[in-house]
Amino acid sequence: MPPFGTLLGYAPGGVAIYSSDYNSLDPWDDDDAAFRSYIDDEYMGHKWQCVEFARRFLFLNYGVVFTDVGMAWEIFSLRFLREVVNDNILPLQAFPNGSPRAPEAGALLIWQKGGEFNETGHVAIITQLLDNKIRIAEQNVIHTPLPPGQQWTRELEMVVENGCYTLRDTFDDTTILGWMIQTDDTQYSLSQPDIANQSLAIRGARLPEKGQFDGQWLDERDPLQKAYVQANGHVINQDPYQYFTITESAEQELIKATNELHLMYLHATDKVLKDDNLLALFDIPKILWPRLRLSWQRRRHHMITGRMDFCMDERGLKVYEYNADSASCHTEAGLILEKWAEQGYTGKGHNPAEGLINELAGAWKHSKARPFVHIMQDDDIEEDYHAQFMQQALHQAGFASKILRGLGELRWDDAGQLIDGDGRLVNCVWKTWAWETAMEQIREVSETEYAAVPIRTGHPENEVRLIDVLLRPEVLVFEPLWTVIPGNKAILPILWSLFPHHRYLLDTDFTVNDELVQTGYAVKPIAGRCGSNIDLVSHQEELLDKTSGKFATQKNIYQQLWCLPKVAGSIFRSVRLPWAVTTAVRACAAMIH
């Protein structure tokens, strides 16, 4: 059998088919990032699996991709493709095996998990239709070179009876789900499957109380754990013996929802940045608009992490917002929850955040970051461990880095360039600060006072501001500037207008419309953070709850009221953390209030 990565032949369009003989690999080679297949900045999948080939075929021949999935059989539940040049979303229809709608060349062919395709299912590309058979191209099935000039891997029998088309596999223990075609025509197509609502229920459970969490159960010899303890003590929540479980189906639904919503947010971001009237709704200083658009054009694929806030229970799964410019929760999900499990958990479940730091390291390896990264954090004890967690990921990815606590160490050299206390040039930054903080500094300056963004290149007292770092053209900042668009709640009404009544969205508007009056609504400032300045209003116009904060003067949006569930007596918020969103979704942390 040819070793892993051997070229076996070509599919139509000159798309290469590679050997996926994992047994030929060094068993000690566990660098997951090395197995990620990219074309330019576009992630294709895990080398050299069937999903990677199918996505690469669509990308090279049609300029479209489907969203990332955990297993090949899950593709059959997707209902759109993304056009890579402009993030447009195109409809994708699924037709069951035995459908009156004939398969066609270029369509995806999907298998259920089981038999030869145990656990994973399978996907192939239909390359040719003949009278009583079809030809397909695929990866991870054949492991020998194709004959010269042959651009298909297998032929499958096609039976036409009573105007319906049925395909029969060459394996006798597999099930073909059907084929998927990019078309607006929904005749004979399947609706998107619903997950059983009971599968989304969050269950409460308790550990036996044996004093596992009395005293110093975190290891303060580890600098990262020590930083967490300095901020929070040896505390994970108010009751460390209480924990919560979700089903595997719910975990997969969260992954699917996060991937799908991320693409929807990108699609909406593209719409906003092409329309001045929409962009004006975000209250972003107009002097930044050209830079925003340039950031989107140049750095669309440079996002490392983000966080979506969901509500999940028997009613369904709804997204509240996308914290696309967020630096928090990595340590809690990727480390502290693991240490909690090691200390007291003896069940068969797993932490969905396990391996988070590996995913982050993989994202950094495929980023455009420069060899040395300055990690910029506020002078805040909680941000100490946020910064240290990311520094560990950068180190694992092979980057050198330095944490800057506050801005006091920075100054300008004689040429007006920014340098740190060691005299090192600052040209690549990962930050814990929100971009909104920098924009607040711009709002303090009259836009008519300067010809461009008011960035200092010197100061009598050497006082460096945040905008003097983040908005310097030569400084590469993660997360990119464009993430202020999906991270601003003004995008929520736009999302609703683009995808009305989508299963994961809540009705949201810039005014209280008739539907919101009937459902009740939440009043949220468009750039608010940490749950500040939110009002909850019932369908009887009764104020249910109200929070204070510093965002009271901001423009508001009005979002359909969708209250958090109570589980085991506590109000529960499930937070899905789509770290490394361009490659993988990872982590599910619980926040209990």
Predicted features and spans:
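N-terminal capping segments
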Residues: 1-80
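Aromatic- and glycine-rich peptidoglycan recognition patches
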Residues: 118-190
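Ordered hydrophobic segments in well-structured contexts
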Residues: 108-110, 123-125, 177-178, 522, ...
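...with weaker cross-activation on analogous glycine-rich loops/strands in unrelated enzymes
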Residues: 76-143
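Preference for protein termini
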Residues: 187-593
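Amphipathic alpha-helical surface "interface" segments used
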Residues: 72-83, 285-291
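Extracytoplasmic/secreted proteins, especially bacterial periplasmic and envelope-associated proteins
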Residues: 49-56, 104, 125, 175
